[in-house]
Amino acid sequence: MNYDRIYSNLVNSAEHPSKPRQTKAGYELHHIIPRSMGGSDDLDNLVFLTYKAHYTAHHLLAKIYGGKMYDAYWIMSNSKHRKVTSSQYAYAKAKKFENQRGAKRSDKTKKLMSIARSKVTLPDDFGKRISDGLTGRTLSTNHKEHIKNSSRNRFNTKTVIGYSPDGNTIELTGATEIRNAGFFHSAVYKCCKGIQSIHKGYTWKYKDEL
């Protein structure tokens, strides 16, 4: 299972905030590149995710990078504001203990892992990700850029055309240009995909599909 691709698709489908400290009912702000890995509070590194999607995002980050990402996943699993299954709770707790104590597991950790694995299907390369030394890993600048670019690449290479009811048109390329023009790029792309019919009075189409 390609967790990197799943994570990229998840953040790609989310909406970026239009201003610092913006809130949205029923959503939480998520750092595409976690702050613990050097991610910034820049708007292009932030997306709104539902509570469930936010939990899923941290689960994916934990599976991709291991180490301290399991600490964040455990915190979310242990929150009173989230409903998680007993197997999710056991798995998150076991991985946090494993991360704290290294490869040497206590009997308690082994028991938790056996409970979790009886209900959670792990990928074939899961053990390899841990053994490859991902624990406590710090991403290089190039790797950070790779993650950021992969999560935004689809948006940044698309040119869209907006049509107003009075016949005016506007041509914009990439999420930044769309935001600077006063539109929400996620809503614009939903219009282009046929998920949404109109955004701020405009209908939208991908230029390369006209």
Curated annotation (Swiss-Prot):
Keywords: Endonuclease, Hydrolase, Nuclease. One of its GO terms (molecular function) is endonuclease activity. Gene3D superfamilies: 1.10.30.50, Winged helix-like DNA-binding domain superfamily/Winged helix DNA-binding domain. Pfam families: HNH. SMART domains: HNHc, IENR1, IENR2. Signal peptide: none annotated. It comes from the Viruses. Residues 25-54 form the HNH domain. To phage T4 mobB and mobD. This is Probable mobile endonuclease C. It comes from Enterobacteria phage T4 (Bacteriophage T4). The gene is mobC.
